[in-house]
Amino acid sequence: MYRLKPFGVLDGREVPLIELFNDKCAVELLPYGAAVRAIRVPDRTGKLTDICLGYDELESYRTLDACFGGTIGRCANRIGGARFTIDGRSYRVTANEGENCLHGGIEGFHKKLWEFTCEENAVTFSYTSPDGEEGFPGAVRVEVTYRLIDNQLTIAYKAAAEQSTVVNLTNHTYFNLGGHSSGTVEDHVLTLRTSRYTPMDSGNIPVGTLAPVEGTPLDFRTPAAFGSRLHDKAFNGGRGYDHNYALDGGEGPVAELWCPATGIGLEMTTSMEGMQLYTAGWLTERKGKDGAVYGQAHGVCLETQHFPNAVNCPAFPSPILRKGETLQQWTAFRFFAR
């Protein structure tokens, strides 16, 4: 089922909050950014708990950074040097993180007001990115469908381009399975079905190779809590995780995240080959929902994606979408408590 509630006004247009709900859980969505605002699931005692970071007002989504819950595009993650070449033609896109392009530029998809349609258990958001937006070639039509069935939220992406361009879509929900206002995620236990990651240079740009996670702090093949690694100066300068994994593929979940305090967990499956693990190391203190105060390491993002900077790395799977092709990909989260 679904229902709409008032949330804000942007450029004279009403921006509603859209809630999908059933007898097991509920998800709140916003047309601004095609974003997830809240996910409420039962903890081990049956108490409904909101497990993702968000804001109480539209203005915060519009003006603040961090991309809370947003759909990221046209190209998620980083493009080194904010430039690339397709079919011999060079393009320069918006540099908004030093000399690099991050999450589609200054006004990425998470900063757009999307159209939407609702059905019984799903919402489909649509947006057409014009030719030249943030420097990217060709117009692209994008649809993102959120579907809630029982205790599973599936996010399905669809895109078509009018000329060859880069398309890499993801969702930037910050999960805190202790409850969105519960503080750091140091106690969260992560399991990943992946044996390799993409090494980066000093600017967080993948260098185009894969390396084994074995023997590094990136190895979560057996369940492990984040613990002190989220603040350890010897690991990523004390910023925690902001690393892309090359998923092993195959059937079944590629990630499990669990909070021992509440018993809430999630299993993630996806059609994508990569996943950025981000533990909010750059999240500055800010006011969130219900008077909560968020800060560094208060959330975990599991951003399924093409590899960062893949358009400049021939050995990586290509993120180029060509005219006549249709991009279709999906990620699903199954919530549980134990």
List the predicted regions and their residue ranges:
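An exposed, glycine/acidic-rich loop-and-rim segment of catalytic or binding clefts
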Residues: 1-338
